[in-house]
Every structure is written in structure tokens, then in C-alpha cells.
From Swiss-Prot:
Substrate binds at D7, S8, Y39, G40, N72, T73, T183, H184. Pfam families: Asp_Glu_race. This is Glutamate racemase. It comes from Sulfurihydrogenibium sp. (strain YO3AOP1). Its EC number is 5.1.1.3. It comes from the Bacteria. Pathway: Cell wall biogenesis; peptidoglycan biosynthesis. GO terms for molecular function: glutamate racemase activity.
């Protein structure tokens, strides 16, 4: 059972890494839409269109049996559409992340950080409230985090100052749990944890693995790994090598996506 995974860029590799470690014999195909990153400042219509193009490319070209939307923005806006048009399971990152946060929070005060589009969608707020109506939820858009990660600035002084600028006031609300509502953000996890060691940091990529375990997977495959991008990116290659090793990156043309 090959699995297709897509994101707007680098961040979804954090999900790819967790899935690859848990399912070493399952074929994985990853598409990073680096030509159009970030999705977080795009309109809902555009986000859905990009997501349909990426998912359709993986489904039609590699016959994947499940799609993982390794992008919180795309999960927030395009999950229902993809489930309607594709005859295979489609897994987003919002529900797994929300469920994990509810499990680990002791004081029921949960912070959510994400792109402007993800926060505006209220997807985490609504999902969390559906799980526990007594939760106190504090949300914060952190639009500069994605460019930081895409540049590879994940643990330098600029990263620390930017994290503090966004999160100091959020932490003062008394939250004990913080959902990283963007798959780019786990690359800043060590910086965030270093500044706020008392927080439970929720990375939905780990929770996604548990959801995949509920799907019957064909483990008789070769464990093939393929990574595609829509534009050349030195930062992508650098972080790819750090996260998942020396897997060859293949560039595909946007016209190949848009023609589907």
C-alpha cells in the first residue's frame, strides 16, 4: 500500500520522517510544493486548488492507496474536498493533533499556533471544542515561522527572538500544552522547548502514525522512498538531508500538476 504525502514545502518532511520510521516497508511518495510555498497566506479557493492538484498528482501517477495532507493549512480547508473526490482514505493533521493535545493537557488550557490561514479557519478551535467543551483555547498566527524554517534558520538568534515575539504573551495565558499547528513548526521545536521547558509540545506527525495504523497497510512492499518538489530549493535539500537522509529529490513542473 503506497502512501502519498504532500505539503507546501519542507514542513511535511517531519511527517514523512515519522511515517517512514514506523512503516519501513511501505512505499512513500512525498510532494513538496516549493514553487508555491507558503499556503498560509493564500485564499481558501487557492488552497483547495493547490491541494487537489498535489493529491491528484500522487494518486494518478503513483497509484497511492492513502493520502496524508502533511500541511495544517491544506488540512483546514481542503480535507473535505479531497475526501469527496478521491476514492481512497485521506488523513489530515488537525484531528490527530487535537486529540493528542487533549490527552496530555492537565489544566485544559491549550495554545495553538499556525499560519494565518489555519488560525483564521478555526479548525483547531472547533475540533478541540468538539472533544472537550470545557477547554480554554488560545490561538496565535505565526506567519514568519514558515519563512524561517524554509531558510533553515531554526536554532539561531533570529529564530529565538522571533519565537519569543510570537509566544511570550501566549504562554502568559497559563497554557500547559502547545499545538504546533503547522508541519514546518516541529523544526523549531527545540528552540520553543528551550525557551518554554514547562510546555507540552504537540507534534501531530506522531499522532498521524497512529491513524495510519488503523488502515490495512501492505507491508510486502520494498520501502521505496521518492521525494518531489515543484521548484529547486537549497534550504529544502539541506533540511531534507538532516531529517530523512540522502533521498534523491526530483523536480516536477507545475504544469504537470495543473494539467490534471
Amino acid at each position: 500500500m503506497p502512501i502519498g504525502i504532500f505539503d507546501s514545502g519542507i514542513g511535511g518532511l517531519t511527517v514523512f520522517k515519522e511515517i517512514a520510521a514506523s512503516f519501513p516497508k511501505v512505499d512513500l511518495y512525498y510532494l513538496g510544493d516549493t514553487a508555491r510555498v507558503p499556503y498560509g497566506n493564500k485564499s481558501k479557493t487557492t488552497i483547495i486548488r493547490y491541494s487537489v492538484e498535489c493529491a491528484s498528482y500522487l494518486y494518478h501517477n503513483y497509484n497511492v492507496d492513502a493520502i496524508v495532507i502533511a500541511c495544517n493549512t491544506a488540512s483546514s480547508y481542503a480535507l473535505d474536498t479531497l475526501r469527496e473526490i478521491l476514492p481512497i482514505p485521506v488523513i489530515g493533521v488537525v484531528q490527530p493533533g487535537a486529540e493528542s493535545a487533549v490527552k496530555v493537557s492537565k489544566n485544559k488550557k491549550i495554545g495553538v499556533i499556525g499560519t494565518s490561514a489555519t488560525i483564521k479557519s478555526n479548525s483547531y478551535f472547533e475540533t478541540l471544542k468538539s472533544l472537550d467543551k470545557d477547554l480554554e483555547i488560545y490561538q496565535k498566527a505565526c506567519p514568519l515561522f514558515v519563512p524561517l524554517v524554509e531558510e533553515g534558520w531554526i536554532d539561531n538568534e533570529v529564530a529565538k527572538l522571533t519565537v519569543k515575539e510570537y509566544l511570550d504573551d501566549l504562554v502568559k495565558t497559563g497554557i500547559d500544552t502547545l499545538i504546533l499547528g503547522c508541519t514546518h513548526y516541529p523544526l523549531l521545536k527545540n528552540t520553543i522547548k528551550g525557551l518554554y521547558p514547562h510546555l507540552n509540545i504537540v507534534d501531530s506527525s506522531v499522532a498521524i502514525v497512529e491513524h495510519l495504523k488503523n488502515i490495512k497497510l501492505n507491508i510486502e512492499e520494498t520501502g521505496k522512498r521518492k521525494i518531489f518538489i515543484t521548484d529547486e530549493s537549497h534550504a529544502f535539500d539541506k533540511l531534507k538531508n538532516m531529517l530523512v537522509g540522502d533521498i534523491k529529490t526530483e523536480k516536477i513542473e507545475l504544469s504537470d500538476l495543473c494539467s490534471l
